Structure formats: structure tokens, C-alpha cells
């Protein structure tokens, strides 16, 4: 029997879903604390930071400073994760309000660091395994599973390899064991994540690692549904797309950040890919029945000229992505693009505004295409007093939209899980739907 300490923990997990998995590992080590969302009441405030781009760094720093103001006398303030790792040599002096700093190598030792009240930065990047106890947050039916850590790509704009290191993939058996354990606890929907998911097992000399994973999950039959985030174009193949299409468990969800479509820009970005390869993959994805395609674009990378931008803009309007993330270029230390001549901010902002207009048009069309037809969905939890929150099974949590189901139209309360529903109305990125039946 686990006995709770009479101490409260406030955990703030910033950044991506990969960071969230590491935060959940830390929660697993700190299971004997009572969780609170109020930093002023906490005995320990733990902030798992993001250090990806400038806006994320600023958010992390501001969150730390706010927590420092809120913390009560005697409380411990901890900054872990990417920001701490990336700036470990100077961060202790820059933010003296923090009691403990730790990076990306010691999530599974957080209880020891708190007990000893010491900083620690291990050289080896931590990669969660099946034996690392996690406390899953946010859902009783969905969990993220991290399949690898680090990245071997050499994109001109990305600093991640400088603090996350080279690609290190988990053993397939470890992933299957984690999936089985989580499924037995009721997590029947999972999202598989990594910095570069399509390169899974490349570091172990296997080029079809992600296909192996898909087929092993299908054979295992522990899950009802799953999807994969963060495919990298140069390591994505037609065979991989086919494996996803053929899977009874993995949804026809394709999240592949292309960053640009112009060949000259892809070369400047050091993406190790080409427009022809992008189009081959994207058109194959679009041919898959009921496919859902998400991508990411960087606007204003150094040396992006008007012609290259117009080529990108025309392509995005023609291809019609279901969802599109558009980022302004962020100059990051220890990257090739950091010292290159910058595109003026005024031009970047104008370009982003134009692309956002295109993205919103096609996003709304994607939502409306679901109206008045049965779709498979995951009901996650009650949202407020009158609604249940759900999402299309193809969608990733949090980022692709939400569906609300009015409980006044139900004869019995809904349990979290898989249902067939019919969306009937759409407004402000939200679909309203009725439940037909569970499946």
C-alpha cells in the first residue's frame, strides 16, 4: 500500500507531449506527494521546461519566475528539462531563485535530487522504459508512448540534437510491454511519439523499425486505436504509409512536418529531402481512405525570398492540409542558420498572416466534412457541467480539435471510451455531436 506524505506537489509540464511523458515519469517517482494546481500551497514546485525555440524559452523562464514569487517559505522550486539542459552552464546564475536544476538525463532520479536538494546533469539522455512507473495525466483512456529519444537529422534551424543528443531507440519488446501494461489499466488509445518517429531503430541498423512496431502492435491486439506523430520526410516511405493504411489499430493519421516545399529552401534548411519526395509521400497519404494529414511550416528562414514563399503559399492552398502549424523562424544558438542574414520581422509577420488565412480555410473545411455522418471517436471525460469531451479517433489529443456531446440528450452517463458519434454542428474549432453507440 502506497502511503501519501503530508506534502503537496505542483507539477507544471511545458512544451510537447514528449516532455509530458518525462513529467509523468517524475510523477511516478513522487507518487507519495499530494498533487495541487496551486503553487502557493505546494511544498515542491516542479517545472519541466521547454527550450526548443525563443517563445518556448521565454514561457519557461516566465513560468519559473512566477513560481518563485508564489512559493511559500521552505518550499523547493525545481527546473528540469530542456531549458535547464540547454543552458546548464549559465542558468544557475541567471535564475538564482531556483533551488534545484536538472536536465534531460535524470527524470527517474527526481525523488533522490529532492531528498538531497542537489543539482544534477547526467550525460546520458533519459529514455523512458516499460519499468519506469508513470502516472498518466489528463485521461483515463489515452496515453502517450515515447519510442525513441534524440535525433540524427541536421536541420539548419533546429537545436534539439545539441541538448537531446543522437537518436536512441527503445527495444521493441520494451515498448510492447509498456503498451500491454497500460492497456490492462484501461488505456486503449495511444499516441506514439519521438523527435523523429520514422527513424525508429535506424540507430540499431534497421530501416523498417516503425513498420515492425505497427505490425507488432496489430498482432498484440491490446489496443483499440493508435496514431503516430512526427514523421520525418527523408525516413518516411511508401511502405510505411501502406503499413499504417493496412493496420486495424493505427488510424490513417499522417503528421509529417515538411517545413517548406521549395527545393531551394529545403536545401537551405538542410532537410535532406526534396519537393518531389514530399509530393510523392503527401499524395500517397491523400490517397489513403479517410486520411487526416497534418504538417508544420517554418516561415522566414534566412534567405527565404518572395518567389520561394509564393511557391509555398500556392502549394499549401492547393494541397489542403487538414491541420497546419505555422511557425516564424527562431534563430537558435548552435545551429547553422543562427548566423545567417535574417528575413525582416515585418516580412515574416505578413507571410505568416497570409498562410494562416489559407490554413484556417482548409481547417474549417476539414471540420465541416465530418458533419452529419457517423465517425469513430474517443470520449475522454466530462467537460464542465453539461458536456462530454471527445475527439475523432484520427486526431491527436489537444491539437487537432475537440468534439462536445451534450449530456442532456443521453439516457445514461457516458463512460470514457470508444463510440460511434454523429457531429451535427460546428463553430470555433468545436464540433457538437450525438452518440450512436459504443464499439
Curated annotation (Swiss-Prot):
SUPFAM superfamilies, per the entry: Radical SAM enzymes
Residue span(s) of domain Radical SAM core: 137-368
One of the record's GO molecular function terms: aspartic acid methylthiotransferase activity
Record text on cofactor binding: Binds 2 [4Fe-4S] clusters. One cluster is coordinated with 3 cysteines and an exchangeable S-adenosyl-L-methionine.
Gene3D superfamilies the record matches: Methylthiotransferase, N-terminal domain, tm_1862 like domain
Superkingdom of origin: Bacteria
Keyword Cytoplasm: yes
UniProt-listed NCBIfam families: 30S ribosomal protein S12 methylthiotransferase RimO, MiaB/RimO family radical SAM methylthiotransferase
Protein name as annotated: Ribosomal protein uS12 methylthiotransferase RimO
Amino acid at each position: 500500500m502506497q502511503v501519501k506524505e503530508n506534502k503537496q506537489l505542483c507539477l507544471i509540464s511545458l512544451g510537447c507531449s514528449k516532455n509530458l511523458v518525462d513529467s509523468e515519469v517524475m510523477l511516478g517517482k513522487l507518487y507519495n506527494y499530494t498533487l495541487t494546481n496551486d503553487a502557493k500551497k505546494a511544498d515542491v514546485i516542479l517545472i519541466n521546461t521547454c527550450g526548443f525555440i525563443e517563445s518556448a524559452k521565454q514561457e519557461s523562464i516566465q513560468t519559473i519566475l512566477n513560481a518563485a514569487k508564489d512559493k511559500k517559505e521552505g518550499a523547493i522550486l525545481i527546473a528540469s528539462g530542456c531549458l535547464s539542459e540547454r543552458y546548464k552552464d549559465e542558468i544557475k546564475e541567471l535564475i538564482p531563485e531556483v533551488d534545484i536544476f536538472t536536465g534531460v538525463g535524470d527524470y527517474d532520479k527526481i525523488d533522490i535530487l529532492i531528498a538531497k536538494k542537489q543539482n544534477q546533469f547526467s550525460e546520458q539522455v533519459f529514455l523512458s522504459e516499460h519499468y519506469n512507473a508513470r502516472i498518466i495525466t489528463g485521461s483515463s483512456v489515452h496515453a502517450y508512448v515515447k519510442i525513441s529519444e534524440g535525433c540524427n537529422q541536421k536541420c539548419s534551424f533546429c537545436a534539439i540534437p545539441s541538448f537531446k543528443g543522437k537518436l536512441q531507440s527503445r527495444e521493441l519488446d520494451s515498448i510492447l510491454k509498456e503498451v500491454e501494461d497500460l492497456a490492462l489499466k484501461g488505456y486503449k488509445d495511444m499516441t506514439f511519439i519521438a523527435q523523429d518517429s520514422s527513424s525508429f531503430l535506424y540507430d540499431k541498423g534497421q530501416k523498417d523499425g516503425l513498420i515492425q512496431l505497427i505490425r507488432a502492435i496489430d498482432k498484440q491486439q491490446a489496443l483499440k486505436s493508435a496514431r503516430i506523430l512526427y514523421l520525418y520526410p527523408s525516413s518516411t516511405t511508401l511502405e510505411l504509409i501502406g503499413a499504417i493504411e493496412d493496420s486495424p489499430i493505427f488510424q490513417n493519421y499522417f503528421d509529417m512536418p515538411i517545413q517548406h516545399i521549395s527545393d531551394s529552401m529545403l536545401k537551405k534548411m538542410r532537410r535532406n529531402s526534396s519537393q518531389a519526395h514530399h509530393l510523392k509521400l503527401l499524395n500517397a497519404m491523400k490517397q489513403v481512405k479517410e486520411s487526416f494529414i497534418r504538417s508544420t511550416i517554418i516561415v522566414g528562414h534566412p534567405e527565404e525570398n518572395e518567389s520561394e514563399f509564393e511557391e509555398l503559399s500556392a502549394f499549401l492552398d492547393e494541397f489542403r492540409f487538414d491541420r497546419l502549424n505555422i511557425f516564424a523562424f527562431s534563430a537558435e544558438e548552435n545551429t547553422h542558420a543562427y548566423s545567417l542574414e535574417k528575413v525582416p520581422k515585418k516580412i515574416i509577420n505578413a507571410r505568416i498572416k497570409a498562410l494562416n488565412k489559407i490554413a484556417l480555410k482548409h481547417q474549417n473545411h476539414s471540420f465541416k466534412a465530418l458533419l452529419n455522418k457517423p465517425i469513430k471517436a474517443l470520449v475522454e471525460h466530462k467537460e464542465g457541467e453539461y458536456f462530454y469531451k471527445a475527439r475523432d479517433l484520427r486526431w491527436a489529443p489537444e491539437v487537432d480539435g475537440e468534439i462536445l456531446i451534450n449530456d442532456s440528450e443521453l439516457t445514461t452517463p457516458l463512460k470514457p471510451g470508444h463510440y460511434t458519434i454523429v457531429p451535427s454542428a460546428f463553430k470555433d474549432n468545436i464540433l457538437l455531436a450525438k452518440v450512436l453507440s459504443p464499439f
